[in-house]
Amino acid sequence: MKPRIPLITIALCGLAVTMCTKPQSNHRSISVSIAPLQYITEQIADSDFRINVLVPSGASPETYEPSPAQMQQVAKSQFYIHTGLIDFERNLEQAIRNNMPDVQQINVSEGVELIAGDCGHNHQNNSEKLAHDHEDSTTHGHTHAQGVDPHIWNSPRAVKQIAATIYEALARQYPDSIRYKNNYHRFISRLDSLDSELTALFGPNTRHAFIIYHPALTYLARDYGLQQIALENEGKEPSAEHMRRIIDTARNLNLTKLFYQRQFSKSTVDALARELKIPAVPIDPLAPDVINNTLEISKLIAQP
């Protein structure tokens, strides 16, 4: 994973010039790192804020780097909401702390029961828990550098904690807003309904396993007893040996579910689909609507 600090530094240089020549307004605007966080924030804040999403649609957070224009958007924001678990987020988190003291950062991974994993997030239903002490935010940033699966927005149980963190930050800033509280509780009710639906969908006595190129469904797999088998190996294209193990596992388990994300190369997926004679199905774990998207993906996994 190539370093991104130099480009952020360049962006900050341009930002410094802009901030010296234009009046700044850091109110009624929120910047978020990825689209799912935009959706979650909107469910609570409604239309009170203009929300800027840094990673554009169709791009991969793994390779994204913020532009100078986006850094200017962040500087004008009242809040910057992120998971703190993706490389560019950590670099940007430090840059904001050093150069944009008026921007309030909301790290939504706080309180979430995290799962161990490297930048490739290669898990086969790995549910190893992590001690998640956020009292030292600097240590927290370094701890996550090579050790935590970041895809916390793909399970409603984790999203409940994400929503709570966002709501609490808004409530501290706007303690008289009853609407944020009501919106938050409505959203939690929807997440509880989704949780119940997924629990019934997967059931306690049914085994559900699937192959996926980039293992973005680790939290969903943990929370609902699924087996996720990743093609990616430590964030890289799988070796011939790794592919052979996956083929053997798929045949032994009679697997028929193969998912891929359009943000990643499809050549390996196509080769595996031909070998196993099963279809390769596109999904988008970064789609904004975390409720409907998680339900749609879950229904694909649960199909006989």
Which residue stretches match the model-derived regions?
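Bacterial N-terminal signal peptides
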Residues: 8-16
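Extracytoplasmic metal-acquisition and chelation regions
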Residues: 19-304
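Bacterial N-terminal signal peptides that target proteins for export
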Residues: 1-8
